[in-house]
């Protein structure tokens, strides 16, 4: 954060999450003796999403759908973040294998060092990443106890939640507060 403050940069935490077409049964109300039920197709058609949350009083949320998680799609996400920020980004990530860039990605990162720097969290420390809270909130608002007939329907619900995060930053403020 000191480095970011010295150059008026923006600290963001990044992560990726998958959302299945199948709904997930989560804590809910039901009549006594009746098991809650969520319809399902039995298919795991997955939406892969990269996301990043800024460490500010009014956190910003950026996201990008990807066909798969790998170094190539991660590079596309980095370019997406840089394109949408006027300030230098300090992106903090976990050690997921998809965050490993190939040679062309490393070269791009070197050429854009004045716009973005990457930092790694210690292994097995998701509690240090507020983006995990954004994913938890997304699943709570979007996929728990819901049945989607199509991937388009699920993706539209996800975009609706992400848009709510962007237009109402207070939804993520609780996940970011301890990092400010």
Segments from the language model and where they lie:
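Short functional hotspots at interaction and active-site rims
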Residues: 1-180
């Amino acid at each position: 954060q000191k480095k970011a403050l010295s150059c008026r940069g923006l600290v963001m935490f990044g992560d990726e999450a998958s959302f299945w077409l199948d709904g997930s049964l989560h804590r809910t109300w039901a009549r006594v003796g009746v098991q809650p039920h969520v319809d399902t197709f039995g298919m795991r058609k997955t939406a892969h999403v990269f996301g990043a949350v800024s460490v500010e009083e009014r956190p910003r949320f950026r996201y990008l759908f990807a066909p798969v998680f790998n170094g190539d799609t991660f590079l596309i996400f980095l370019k997406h973040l840089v394109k949408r920020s006027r300030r230098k980004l300090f992106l903090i990530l976990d050690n997921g294998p998809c965050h490993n860039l190939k040679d062309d990605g490393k070269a791009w990162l070197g050429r854009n060092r004045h716009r973005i720097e990457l930092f790694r969290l210690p292994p097995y420390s998701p509690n240090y990443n507020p983006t995990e809270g954004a994913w938890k909130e997304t699943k709570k608002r979007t996929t728990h106890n819901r049945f989607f007939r199509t991937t388009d329907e699920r993706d539209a619900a996800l975009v609706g939640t992400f848009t709510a995060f962007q237009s109402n930053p207070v939804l993520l403020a609780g996940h970011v507060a301890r990092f400010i």
